[in-house]
């Protein structure tokens, strides 16, 4: 119904158009090029974060010629989506921006455009993505209006204090793969449990797991 309203047509026609687009995309699919540019997004405090400790182990295993960019969304300036209408969101997207502007438009949008792989660094406190990461995902909608992410791989590093890491992995799949069109590789996420500060690096075999990932 929503696609029919956007396209100014009836639901059956909108369904057939969406189906034709999907078939054409599947028929033309090619394996994405090798990863050369990695973007890592997080909202953690480096001094105390087990999630960032896991990322450091993973990052250490990346090829030396791979470009890696990290953006911290913790500085308090990440406003959530304003809930603009489709036409308003499309308008801002066509201008390369978003209603609120700020770091999301100045830093995150250009970095997402450049990257071949997006790594979401997710600390699990309440079986949900952190508020700043959620706001970031929501505000990627304006970029998505103009840029499809079919050739950008999605990865997740998820560290829980107790349990529930699988719930965050599902949220990443739903929000960024199914909704925002990021390419989902096999075994895209690494889930670990580390409650106490600094305990992640003491987990048995963690360095080998991180290197393999």
Regions found by a protein language model. Give the residues of each.
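Short, glycine-/small-residue-rich phosphate/pyrophosphate-handling segment
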Residues: 1-23, 149-189
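Extended non-globular C-terminal regions
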Residues: 192-193
